[in-house]
Regions:
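Short beta-strand scaffold segments in enzyme catalytic cores
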Residues: 43-52
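Small-residue (primarily alanine) positions within well-ordered alpha-helices
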Residues: 28, 32-35, 45, 56, ...
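A short, polar/charged loop-to-alpha-helix boundary motif
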Residues: 63-75, 80
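Short beta->alpha transition motifs characteristic of CBS
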Residues: 55-62, 122
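Immediate flanking context of iron-sulfur cluster ligation sites
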Residues: 87-100
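Zinc-dependent deaminase
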Residues: 1-35, 108-175
Length: 175
């Protein structure tokens, strides 16, 4: 069982990832590999229902042919979950993602009222893989800082399984 530091707008606590958390995080990583195999950026996110059944998932669609830079996996999965779950269910839902949500996606997660985020690859580690690639400009703004500015808390667990998540990025951002 992996132990991580959980942070929300109010406090930090030590929390262990469950076997279900690890299973769903690995599924998000697998979906990021599938996104890459389709010629997309190697990112993915999913939201399960209370029973652990995936009800929303998305790979990254922010590059051609769509060319919409807002179509990050986390934003798309959060929006799909918001269309399918009640406000109460969203507040107790978890979004699993192959990489730490950027500030745009953290805002979308917050506005969708998703109560918990579990991520694999940290923004800092991602930057070491992408460098200054023009298709992945980054902010030095951890999602925890975005959530900390809100009126309700979002529990954040991660990074976890970083080496597994990094494999989908190997060689993608070079050349």
């Amino acid at each position: 069982m992996a132990t991580l530091i959980a942070a929300d707008a109010n406090a930090a606590a030590t929390t262990a990832l469950s076997e279900q958390d690890l299973r769903l995080l690995r599924e998000a990583i697998r979906l990021s590999e599938a996104s890459r195999a389709r010629g997309r950026h190697p990112f993915a996110a999913l939201v399960p229902d209370a029973d652990g059944n995936i009800i929303a998932s998305a790979g990254n669609n922010s590059m051609p042919p769509e060319g919409d830079p807002t179509q990050h996996a986390e934003l798309a999965a959060a929006a799909e979950a918001a269309r399918k779950l009640s406000a109460q269910a969203l507040a107790s839902a978890t979004l699993y993602t192959s990489a730490e949500p950027c500030c745009m996606c953290a805002g979308a997660i917050y506005w969708c009222n998703i109560g918990r985020v579990v991520y694999a690859l940290s923004e800092h580690r991602l930057l070491t893989l992408t460098g200054a690639h023009p298709e992945n400009p980054t902010f030095s703004l951890p999602c925890r800082e975005v959530f900390a500015r809100g009126q309700h808390s979002v529990v954040v667990l991660g990074p976890a399984l970083e080496d597994e998540a990094a494999r989908a990025h190997a060689g993608f951002w070079q050349g």
